[in-house]
């Protein structure tokens, strides 16, 4: 892989990792989906989390395209397809977002993705 392309990919992976860490940190106090739905701060947290999930999913799609689908298969422990699919659901069906799914992804799936920069460097 060309050096400048490799640097760009590592930079983007770091941005994804930072966004994932923010999602995890910002949702530490959210224990159940009711924490999203029953308070104004909870709804704001859900909405901001969805925006970051869109950004992460879009960045992953870009990485997949820019690496000719060669990078993501090297890390099968990450649910890449799920991350890209969640981005599509949030972006195109925003009013049908399931807070339970968002919370589950943040609590269960994102910790693996948060190690991405270390995995790929």
What are these regions (language model features)?
Residues 1-121:
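Solvent-exposed interaction patches of small proteins and small membrane subunits
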């Amino acid at each position: 892989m060309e050096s400048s392309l490799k640097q760009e990919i590592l930079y983007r992976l770091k941005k994804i990792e930072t966004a994932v860490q923010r999602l995890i940190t910002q949702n530490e106090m959210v224990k159940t989906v009711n924490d999203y739905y029953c308070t104004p701060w909870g709804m704001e947290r859900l909405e901001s989390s969805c925006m970051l999930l869109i950004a992460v999913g879009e960045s992953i799609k870009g990485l997949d395209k820019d690496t000719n689908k060669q990078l993501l298969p090297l890390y099968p422990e990450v649910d890449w397809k799920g991350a890209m699919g969640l981005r599509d659901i949030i972006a195109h069906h925003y009013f049908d977002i399931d807070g339970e799914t968002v919370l589950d992804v943040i609590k269960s799936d994102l910790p693996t993705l948060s190690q991405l920069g270390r995995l790929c460097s």
